[in-house]
UniProtKB/Swiss-Prot annotation:
It comes from Tetramorium bicarinatum. GO terms for cellular component: extracellular region. It is found in: Secreted. This is U4-myrmicitoxin-Tb1a. Belongs to the formicidae venom precursor-01 superfamily.
Length: 56
């Protein structure tokens, strides 16, 4: 059985999609709005921890 060029092309595209997908996810995490929400959540956590007598 001889593999066709079309099958080889699809296999190469599939491998490239797998290789480059983590880079796309990393860019999505660098959103300014998401960072602002994360900072707000941390400051609320720190206030609650300080109110309950936790470490500063």
């Amino acid at each position: 059985m001889q593999p066709s060029y079309l099958l080889l092309t699809f296999a190469i595209i599939f491998v490239m999609v797998i290789m480059y997908s983590p880079a796309v996810e990393a860019k999505a995490g660098a959103d300014a709005d998401a960072d602002a929400h994360a900072d707000a959540g941390c400051s609320q956590f720190r206030r609650m921890r300080n109110l309950c007598g936790g470490k500063k």
